[in-house]
Every structure is written in structure tokens, then in C-alpha cells.
């Protein structure tokens, strides 16, 4: 039994994520758990399941190894910069395109909102838990057998399936998110996480990226409730396409370097 679980460890966990979240969200709907427990608990339960799984298959060393990417901080500053500005840049591009489409001044759409310190801390904690579960474990494990890009897209499917009950409940997430748009956006999010992680092996960079995603969604008028569903969908599409562009450019650059190296050797 242990050998079977160890062999299919990451797939077992990916399947468990959306399955476990359904009764957890239902418990919130029925009022069995409070809002505060639900908000962070939905992430904590994933980490708890993962730690239990790793203890069973790998022991304490497996759990310690799970958090190792969070110790990697010595990476080129460009990756920190990309993680810092990428989400907000996509949001600004979306709003500029919106203003062009409606033929109005950009200032009519671009506005930045602030929230409480408690909310910012919550966004950071959620980003941390998400980074450990979805990136430091899922994407890293899948990348051992398949290319990081494909690993990110596979994780995006299960990540979105995990989010669907949360979206339907509409608590602890942006209200009125179209599920199809959520899928598109999560493909972009997971793809960017895989891109950053594959180049840095740094959980800190991914944590910064995900924190900025959360801040961007609440700071700029791109949510369905304050920007409209089409704005959110456009944001998700641009995020996804830009992610594809970065992966494509990276492939071409690496392929070109490989060809030049082969020519030098010949």
C-alpha cells in the first residue's frame, strides 16, 4: 500500500484537494464553521493533508524538504522585479485597453483601493500556503517527470477545481467570478508560478508573485463587482497569453543558444 501511495503521491494529493474542499465549503454553508476558520482553514486543510501524506510516504525528511524552496533567496534581482510588477502591469494593460475600447480617459478606470492591515496579512498567509502546496510540492514534483510548463497547466486544472466550490459560495473570494474565466486565469497564474520557479527554484519569488496577484485583484477595478465580468475575463486572458509569450520566448532563447553551442562544437 505504501509503495502504491508513494508512486502516485502527487496525483493522489491533487485529486484529494478538490474532493476534500467540497465538504469543507458545505460545512461553512451549513454554519458548522465560522467565517474566520473557513477563510484560512481552506488553505490549512490542504497543507495538513499534504504533511500527513508526506509523513506516510517519506517521513519527517519529506516534510522538511517541502519547505526548502522558501530558503532559496539568492536569485537574480530581475526575478524579484518580475514577480513584483507582473500582476499589476497586466491589470494596467487591461484597464488601458478598456479605456481605449470605450473611448474614455484612462483615469476614468484606473484607481487603486486600499484595505486593512489585517486583510493584507491574510493575503500574504494565503499566498504562502498556496505557494507551499501548489508550487513547492505539486509543480516541483510533476516537473521531475514532465516539463515545468505542462506541470503548471496540470496543477491549474486541480487548483481551479479546488476553487469552484469557493466561487459558488462566494465567500473569501471575489464575488461573481465566471467559472470559465477562473479557469483561464488560473492557467495563467499556475503557468507564471511554474515559470518563476523553474528559473529560480525560489519559493520566496513565487510567494512575492502570488502576494502581488492577491493585492492586484483587490486594489485595481478588475473584479467582476467593481470592473465587470468582461474586465476580469480580459485580465485573465491577457495574463494567460502573456504567460504563454514568456514561455515561448524562453524556449526560443534556449533553443537558439543550444544551436549556437552545437555549431561551435562542430
Regions found by a protein language model. Give the residues of each.
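Alpha-helical transmembrane segments and their helix-entry boundary regions
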Residues: 10-14, 79-80, 137, 151-152, ...
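Functionally important transmembrane alpha-helices
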Residues: 177-232
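Membrane-helix boundary elements
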Residues: 149-174
Amino acid at each position: 500500500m505504501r509503495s502504491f501511495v508513494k508512486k502516485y503521491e502527487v496525483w493522489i494529493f491533487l485529486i484529494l484537494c478538490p474532493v476534500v474542499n467540497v465538504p469543507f465549503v458545505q460545512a461553512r454553508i451549513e454554519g458548522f464553521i465560522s467565517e474566520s476558520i473557513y477563510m484560512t482553514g481552506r488553505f490549512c486543510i490542504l497543507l495538513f493533508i499534504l504533511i500527513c501524506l508526506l509523513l506516510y510516504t517519506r517521513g519527517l525528511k519529506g516534510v522538511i524538504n517541502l519547505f526548502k524552496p522558501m530558503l532559496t533567496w539568492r536569485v537574480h534581482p530581475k526575478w524579484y522585479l518580475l514577480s513584483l510588477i507582473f500582476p499589476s502591469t497586466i491589470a494596467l494593460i487591461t484597464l488601458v485597453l478598456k479605456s481605449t475600447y470605450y473611448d474614455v480617459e484612462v483615469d476614468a478606470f484606473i484607481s487603486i483601493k486600499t484595505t486593512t492591515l489585517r486583510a493584507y496579512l491574510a493575503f500574504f498567509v494565503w499566498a504562502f500556503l498556496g505557494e507551499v502546496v501548489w508550487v513547492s510540492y505539486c509543480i516541483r514534483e510533476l516537473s521531475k517527470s514532465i516539463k515545468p510548463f505542462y506541470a503548471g497547466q496540470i496543477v491549474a486544472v486541480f487548483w481551479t477545481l479546488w476553487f469552484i466550490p469557493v466561487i459558488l459560495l462566494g465567500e473569501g473570494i471575489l464575488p461573481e467570478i465566471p467559472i470559465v474565466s477562473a479557469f483561464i486565469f488560473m492557467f495563467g497564474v499556475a503557468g507564471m508560478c511554474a515559470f518563476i520557479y523553474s528559473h529560480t527554484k525560489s519559493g520566496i519569488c513565487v510567494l512575492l508573485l502570488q502576494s502581488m496577484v492577491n493585492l492586484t485583484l483587490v486594489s485595481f477595478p478588475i473584479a467582476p463587482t467593481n470592473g465587470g465580468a468582461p474586465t476580469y475575463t480580459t485580465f485573465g486572458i491577457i495574463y494567460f497569453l502573456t504567460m504563454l509569450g514568456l514561455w515561448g520566448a524562453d524556449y526560443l532563447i534556449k533553443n537558439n543558444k543550444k544551436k549556437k553551442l552545437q555549431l561551435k562544437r562542430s
